[in-house]
């Protein structure tokens, strides 16, 4: 009899736990995805902060030339970063227990792998948690679909690109100037600015900013007056009110006359779908572009494409970009290569056909 009571009691504890996990009455929804999301994001955050402040230099290129990224080694908020794991590690999984000592793990950039793996798992669980909460509340599932765009971008630069390039040392450093360095080197090696998918991403981000500003300013300019001149317009809205807080007909009429009639949405649902879809689709394409360039399917190359009747090159903007790319490429990892690939792979140009005679 006692055993039966204990089993029922433990079952009740589990049921109460399940109810609490999936309850939408909690101040912050946990959910089953949250059970994995919370510890992974906490681990990534704690490790990132410690490494950003105090990690020793990392041998990122695998040539015994450590690069310092932490604050106590002389960096500031702008120049500091969690430096990617060593090229000597490559794509090997490098947890703490795989290193001979903690010093070796730090020297080879182990914290970078710890942060990005926990971060990506946590972000994927955050997407799942968005779907889970939407499901519990009876909402449509498009919030997590929109979030998939930044998640795809993070996965592209932290996981897909290193896999394609053969080493986590090619992943994006976790810092401000490290991000810029990653972008510059990416342009040098892959000509990303000439890739159509990156162009779509630029259109998505800048267009999304423009449409967001247009929508916000139109709504703010066509609010239904509910207050006096000496009160804030914001007091004219009560949370949960049934009435429209702005006049969509007035906004439609204004914008339709400013541009032309059919440039203005007359359906609020279509408008807000468009505002969500435009940047999301653009960022999807950029993430897809980075993921294909990871395997060296690069941007367009129009270098020396225009020649005159004598076969001489007429320089275009593409040739200027090519020269800039070569300059950026020869400057990065300058001690790791004798020649950058673009310079070493071309045909050999003879410098002198015969040795000069020295008289005297």
From Swiss-Prot:
It holds the Pfam family Photo_RC. SUPFAM superfamilies: Bacterial photosystem II reaction centre, L and M subunits. InterPro entries: D1/D2 (IPR055266), Photo_II_D1/D2_sf (IPR036854), Photo_RC_L/M (IPR000484), Photo_RC_L/M_CS (IPR055265), PSII_D1 (IPR005867). The chain crosses the membrane at residues 29-46, 118-133, 142-156, 197-218, 274-288. Fe cation binds at residues 215, 272. A quinone binds at residues 215, 264-265. Tyr-161 forms a radical intermediate that is referred to as redox-active TyrZ, YZ or Y-Z. C-terminally processed by CtpA; processing is essential to allow assembly of the oxygen-evolving complex and thus photosynthetic growth. This is Photosystem II protein D1 1.
């Amino acid at each position: 009899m006692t055993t039966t009571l204990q089993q029922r009691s433990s079952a009740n504890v589990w049921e109460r736990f399940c109810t609490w996990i999936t309850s939408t009455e909690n101040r912050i929804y946990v959910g089953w995805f949250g059970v994995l999301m919370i510890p992974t994001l906490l681990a990534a955050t704690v490790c990132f902060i410690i490494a950003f402040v105090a990690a020793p230099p990392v041998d990122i290129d695998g040539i015994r030339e450590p690069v310092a990224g932490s604050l106590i080694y002389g960096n500031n908020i702008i120049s500091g970063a969690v430096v990617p794991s060593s090229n000597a590690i490559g794509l090997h999984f490098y947890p703490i227990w795989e290193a001979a000592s903690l010093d070796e793990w730090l020297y080879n950039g182990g914290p970078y792998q710890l942060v990005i793996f926990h971060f990506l798992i946590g972000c994927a669980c955050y997407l799942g948690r968005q779907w889970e909460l939407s499901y519990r509340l009876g909402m449509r599932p498009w919030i997590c679909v929109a979030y998939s765009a930044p998640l795809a971008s993070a996965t592209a630069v932290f996981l897909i690109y290193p896999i394609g390039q053969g080493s986590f040392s090619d992943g994006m450093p976790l810092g401000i100037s490290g991000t810029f360095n990653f972008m510059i080197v990416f342009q040098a090696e892959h000509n990303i600015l000439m890739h159509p998918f990156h162009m779509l991403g630029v259109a998505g981000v800048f267009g999304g900013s423009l449409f967001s500003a247009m929508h916000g300013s139109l709504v703010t300019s066509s609010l239904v007056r509910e207050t006096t001149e000496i009160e804030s317009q914001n007091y004219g809205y009560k949370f949960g009110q049934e009435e429209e807080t702005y006049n969509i007909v007035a906004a439609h009429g204004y914008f339709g006359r400013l541009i032309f009639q059919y440039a203005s949405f007359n359906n609020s649902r279509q408008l807000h779908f468009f505002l969500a879809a435009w940047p999301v689709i653009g960022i999807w394409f950029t993430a897809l572009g980075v993921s294909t360039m990871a395997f060296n399917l690069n941007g367009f190359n129009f270098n020396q494409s225009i020649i005159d009747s004598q076969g001489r090159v007429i320089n275009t903007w593409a040739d200027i970009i090519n020269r800039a790319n070569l300059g950026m490429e020869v400057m990065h990892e300058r001690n790791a290569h004798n020649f950058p690939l673009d310079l070493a792979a071309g045909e050999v140009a003879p410098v002198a056909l015969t040795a000069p005679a020295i008289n005297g």
